[in-house]
Regions:
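Enriched for short, Lys/Arg-rich terminal
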Residues: 58, 65-93
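Arg/Lys-rich, positively charged N-terminal/basic patches that mediate binding to nucleic acids
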Residues: 1-34
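Conserved phosphate-interacting/catalytic interface
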Residues: 37
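Generic structural signal for well-ordered secondary structure
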Residues: 4, 27-30, 46-50, 58, ...
Length: 93
């Protein structure tokens, strides 16, 4: 029921309310999504709102899920039991 680990130090910094230059344009929506991820008790909790566009990933990211932050950025993570692990904000394109 919480974010257990971060895969990216910059993502953890955003979650801890620190400024990260490369995420300056998406700071607010990224923080909102990270907070939602931290509060989720099940993966199903992340299906709302629909704008999250929760997706189970395939290929080289098999086993991961993603939440849409913007057209360009996603929050990718692994879901284990009731926790998110290896959380990172990635430039998806």
């Amino acid at each position: 029921m919480a974010i257990r680990t971060f895969k990216c130090a910059d993502t953890e910094a955003v979650f801890q309310l620190r400024r990260v230059a490369r995420f300056a344009n998406i700071e607010r929506p990224a923080l909102r999504k990270l907070k939602q991820l931290d509060l989720a008790r099940s993966i199903e909790d992340l299906r709302a709102p629909p704008a999250n566009r929760l997706e189970q990933l395939m290929g080289d990211r098999a086993g991961q899920w993603s939440l849409r932050v913007s057209d360009q950025f996603r929050i990718c993570f692994r879901w284990t039991g009731s926790d998110a692990e290896e959380v990172e904000i990635v430039d998806y394109h």
